[in-house]
C-alpha cells in the first residue's frame, strides 16, 4: 500500500468553509475602518477649531477688543478677522490651521466637512453669546 501525500477533498472543503466563516465574522469589523478614520479626522478638526477659538479669544482679551463687533488679531503672522472676541467664520479655518486641500470649507455657512453629516459647524459669536463649534460624525 502506498503512503498517500496531500489533503483529501473533504479536508480542503473544510478549510475553505472555516476560512469563509472567519472572513464573514472579521469583514464587518475591518469594513468600517474608513468611517472611523473620517470620524477621527473631523473630531481632530473640531478640536483644532476649539483651540483656535480659545487662543483668539485670549488674544482679544489681551488686546482689549473682545467686546468689539469686528476687529483683527494677528497669530503667527496671519491676520484673523474677529467678531466679539472670537474668530469670524471667514477666518476660522486659517486660525485653526485647517487646509482646504483636506476639508471642504464653506466660509458662508461655517461648515467644515469631509462629507455630508461628517462635519464641524462653526457659528459666529454675537454680542450676547460666544462662538460655537459643533461636531457631527453621524455620517462618517
Predicted regions and their residues:
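Residue-level preference for alpha-helix termini and adjacent loops
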Residues: 6-9, 32, 41, 72-74, ...
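Periplasmic/extracellular, small/polar-rich flexible segments of pilin-like filament-forming proteins
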Residues: 58-140
Amino acid at each position: 500500500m502506498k503512503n498517500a501525500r496531500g489533503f483529501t477533498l473533504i479536508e480542503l472543503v473544510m478549510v475553505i468553509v472555516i476560512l469563509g466563516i472567519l472572513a464573514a465574522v472579521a469583514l464587518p469589523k475591518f469594513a468600517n475602518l474608513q468611517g472611523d478614520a473620517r470620524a477621527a479626522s473631523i473630531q481632530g478638526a473640531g478640536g483644532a477649531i476649539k483651540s483656535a477659538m480659545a487662543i483668539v479669544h485670549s488674544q482679544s482679551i489681551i488686546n482689549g477688543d473682545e467686546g468689539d463687533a469686528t476687529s483683527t488679531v494677528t497669530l503667527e503672522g496671519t491676520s484673523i478677522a474677529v467678531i466679539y472676541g472670537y474668530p469670524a467664520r471667514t477666518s476660522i479655518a486659517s486660525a485653526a490651521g485647517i487646509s482646504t486641500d483636506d476639508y471642504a470649507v464653506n466660509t458662508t455657512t461655517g461648515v467644515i466637512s469631509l462629507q455630508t453629516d461628517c462635519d464641524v459647524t462653526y457659528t459666529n459669536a454675537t454680542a450676547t453669546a460666544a462662538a460655537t463649534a459643533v461636531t457631527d460624525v453621524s455620517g462618517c
